[in-house]
Design a protein with these regions (language model features):
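Metal-dependent phosphohydrolase cores
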Residues: 1-188
Length: 188
C-alpha cells in the first residue's frame, strides 16, 4: 500500500508538471497550476491508491472491477476541463454542451500530459493523435459535444503533422480555430 501511495503521488505530480508545461505554452498558466487539485481529495486519492497499477488509470481499473468509480464521478464534476462536466438535460438522456475555449484548451493539455505519463518513451504527437482518434473521436459512446471533438481533432492533427506542440503557442490561431469550429453550431 505504501508503494501505491508513493507511485500514485509521483504520477500525479509528473502529470501536473506536464499539464503546467503545456498550459504555459497555451497561455493558461493559472489553469495549469490549479489543474486536477481534486486528485488530492480523500474521495479521489484513497480510491486511486487502492486500485493503483503501473501504466493504467486506477479509476478505470476500479470501474472495470466494480462497474463504477466514485472518484471518477467526483473528479469529472469538480474539474471543468472534463467533457463530462459539460452535460445537461439528464432527465432526457443527457445533452453535451460546448465547453468554453479555456477548458477545451486545458483538456488538450490534460490529454497530452496523460500521454506523457502512460506512453512514456513511446510518446509522440502522432501516437497521441492516434490515441485520440481511437478512444475519443471515433468512439460513438463519448458524450462530448461534436464541435469540441472536432476542435480537439484539428489540434491533435496539427500537432501530429508537425510532431510538435508549438501550435499551442500561437494563441490567436488556436482561438480562431476554436471560434470557427464552434460557430458552425447550426451544422450539428
Amino acid at each position: 500500500m505504501i508503494n501505491n501511495i508513493i507511485n500514485h503521488t509521483k504520477n500525479i505530480v509528473e502529470h501536473k508538471k506536464w499539464v503546467f508545461h503545456y498550459a504555459c505554452k497555451a497561455g493558461i498558466p493559472i489553469q495549469g497550476l490549479t489543474h486536477d487539485l481534486s486528485k488530492f481529495s480523500p474521495t479521489e486519492f484513497i480510491e486511486a491508491i487502492q486500485y493503483y497499477k503501473e501504466g493504467i488509470s486506477p479509476l478505470k481499473e476500479n470501474k472495470r472491477v466494480n462497474g463504477y468509480s466514485l472518484a471518477k464521478l467526483h473528479h469529472c464534476h469538480h474539474n471543468k476541463h472534463h467533457y463530462e462536466y459539460w452535460q445537461d438535460e439528464f432527465d432526457k438522456g443527457g445533452k453535451p454542451l460546448i465547453m468554453p475555449f479555456n477548458y477545451a484548451l486545458e483538456l488538450i493539455c490534460d490529454y497530452l500530459a496523460a500521454g506523457r505519463i502512460y506512453f512514456k518513451d513511446d510518446f509522440s504527437y502522432k501516437v497521441e493523435y492516434k490515441w485520440f482518434l481511437e478512444h475519443k473521436y471515433n468512439n460513438k459512446s463519448i458524450a462530448m459535444h461534436p464541435l469540441i471533438l472536432e476542435f480537439l481533432k484539428e489540434m491533435f492533427s496539427l500537432m501530429a503533422e508537425y510532431n510538435s506542440s508549438k501550435i499551442l503557442t500561437d494563441h490567436h490561431f488556436v482561438k480562431r480555430l476554436y471560434t470557427s469550429i464552434v460557430n458552425n453550431i447550426g451544422e450539428q
